[in-house]
Amino acid sequence: MIDVVEIQKILPHRYPFLLIDRVCELETGKSVYAYKNITIAEQIFEGHFPGHPIYPGVMIIEGMAQAGGILAFKSAEDPSGLSIENKVVYFMSIDRAKFRNPVKPGDKLEYRLEVLKHKGNVWVLDGKAYVDDKLVAEAELKAMIVDK
């Protein structure tokens, strides 16, 4: 398990754009399971939408990307010993994104990503997001680890 303090040592994101609360499972080079608790206090709900708060799909995709970034970094560290101190993960593309159900305040948004392909510093991931085991979004993500 990786808590938010450790996550901040891996990712450069900070409030209000750090979209992972905890990593529950991580199998290096293979998969990651992480989540974010969605609350009405999220800054995004001031405008999306007043009186009918819906967590934006682009934020769900970004949360998937952050979980994928953690997976890529932790996989690159182990067993190669690569230092991630001066590295960053750049999001390269999103393919086949679909939004299936709305995400609302009070939901526990779960991210499950699996590595489809990894070559050098490029990662292709199958990302899915769930609330109460119900699929809310999915996409194929591509990212690259580069020097800062």
Swiss-Prot record:
Involved in unsaturated fatty acids biosynthesis. Catalyzes the dehydration of short chain beta-hydroxyacyl-ACPs and long chain saturated and unsaturated beta-hydroxyacyl-ACPs. GO terms for cellular component: cytoplasm; membrane. GO terms for molecular function: (3R)-hydroxyacyl-[acyl-carrier-protein] dehydratase activity. It is found in: Cytoplasm. This is 3-hydroxyacyl-[acyl-carrier-protein] dehydratase FabZ. Pfam families: FabA. It comes from Campylobacter fetus subsp. fetus (strain 82-40). It catalyses: a (3R)-hydroxyacyl-[ACP] = a (2E)-enoyl-[ACP] + H2O. The lineage of its organism: Bacteria, Pseudomonadati, Campylobacterota, Epsilonproteobacteria, Campylobacterales. InterPro entries: FabA_FabZ (IPR013114), FabZ (IPR010084), HotDog_dom_sf (IPR029069). GO terms for biological process: fatty acid biosynthetic process; lipid A biosynthetic process. Keywords: Cytoplasm, Lipid A biosynthesis, Lipid biosynthesis, Lipid metabolism, Lyase.
